Amino acid sequence: MQIRNVYGIDLGTSTVKIYDLKKDTITKEKNMIAIRNREQVIAVGNYAYEMHERTPSNIEVITPMSNGRIANVLMVEAVLHTLLHRCTRHMGYRPELYFSVPCDMTEIERRSLVHFICVISNGNHLFAVAYGIIFFSFVIVSFFRS
C-alpha cells in the first residue's frame, strides 16, 4: 500500500510543527521572521530566532502570532510558505495538508486563515482539525495505516 503525501501543520504562537506521514517525523521551528526595512524577508523559523536581539536597526525580528491569535496575516503566510517549502521540498503531486486550528476563532481570523491556507496549498486537499499535533498525528497514522 502506497502512503499518500500527507502533512499536518500546527500553527502555534511560539512554534510551528509540521508532521510528515511518510517519514513519520515532526519538524519544530520557531514562529519568527526577520525582515529588512519592513519589506524583505531575511530569515524564517529557527534561523530568525538565532538573529533575535542581534540584528542591526534596519532588520526587525518579529513573531507573527500573539496570544494564540494571528497578529500579521502576511507574515504568517510568509512563515508557513517558507517552512512548508523547507520541510517538504519533494512533496510530490497534490499532498494533503491538515491544519490544527483553534475552536474559538473570530470570523475575521477564520477568513484570514482560510485565505492564506488557500494561497499556500495551491488548491491541494485541505483539512482543518481542532486538536493539537500529537493527537492529530495519532489520528492520521492510525487512519492511513489501518
PLM features per residue range, with description:
Residues 1-13, 17-29, 34-42, 46-146:
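Nucleotide/phosphate-binding catalytic cleft detector across ATP-hydrolyzing
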